[in-house]
Design a protein with these regions (language model features):
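Hydrophobic core residues within well-ordered beta-strands of beta-rich domains
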Residues: 3-5, 88, 102
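Short, hydrophobic/aromatic-enriched beta-strand segments in well-ordered soluble domains
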Residues: 22, 91-94
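Catalytic strand-loop segment that frames the active site of acyl-thioester-processing enzymes
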Residues: 1-41, 159-173
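Compact, glycine-rich, soluble single-domain proteins
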Residues: 35-42, 47-55, 70
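Conserved positions in beta-strands of structured domains
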Residues: 7-10, 74, 79, 93-95, ...
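Hydrophobic beta-strand-centered segment that forms part of the acyl-chain substrate-binding groove
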Residues: 54-89, 123
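Hydrophobic residues on conserved beta-strands that form the core of alpha/beta folds
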Residues: 6, 70-73, 103, 115-117
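HotDog/MaoC-like acyl-thioester-processing domains
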Residues: 14-17, 83-84, 93-173
Length: 173
């Protein structure tokens, strides 16, 4: 089973920046143990949500031709927690995109305020780790992750279609 720690993309600028959201719900079992009586989204899972947002951004920059693996959490600092009822916003920006790796600067927001900064380093596994015997199929970008990006793109197409329809009918009046 694969845990997905983002719910949707709200912005996606290829090779540059992605913004995703995570709605925190008390229905999530991990919140009942962290912490009993005061449930918060564990910072480790916030880092994973940012890594998923950024990993899709990095993978898309190369048309998902390579496996992108989180190589290092360079820095993660949090000023506050997300709690049930909150919506976290993950903003990931590519700082460097090279043949073997990519560097990401990430900011986490809650209710419009910054609550964390995260710097991540990703490796392109097909180039950097060919001797590890990784499976041929792209196990990093499974259908669940690609569905998040495709749903965002479908929403953009639908919005463009609606905007075009409004423009064409408003010219007749």
């Amino acid at each position: 089973m694969r845990w997905i720690w983002i719910d949707a993309f709200t912005e996606f600028e290829s090779r540059k920046r992605a913004v995703a959201i995570k709605n925190i719900s008390l229905a999530e079992e991990h919140l009942h143990d962290h912490f009993p009586g005061y449930p918060v989204m564990p910072p480790s899972l916030v880092i994973e949500g940012m890594a998923q947002t950024a990993g899709i951004l990095v993978g898309e920059a190369r048309d998902f031709a390579e496996k992108v693996i989180l190589a290092k959490v360079q820095r993660a600092e949090f000023d506050d927690y997300g709690v049930p009822g909150d919506q976290l916003v993950y903003e990931a920006t590519i700082e460097s995109l090279k043949e073997a790796a990519a560097g990401i600067a990430g900011t986490v927001y809650r209710r419009g305020s910054k609550i964390g900064t995260i710097s991540l380093l990703f490796s392109h596994a097909d180039r950097a780790m060919t001797d590890l015997g990784l499976p041929e199929h792209n196990f990093v970008f499974n259908d669940q992750f690609l569905d998040l990006l495709n749903t965002y793109r479908a929403g953009l197409r639908q919005k463009q279609f609606r905007d075009d329809s409004v423009d064409s009918t408003s010219g007749d009046a």
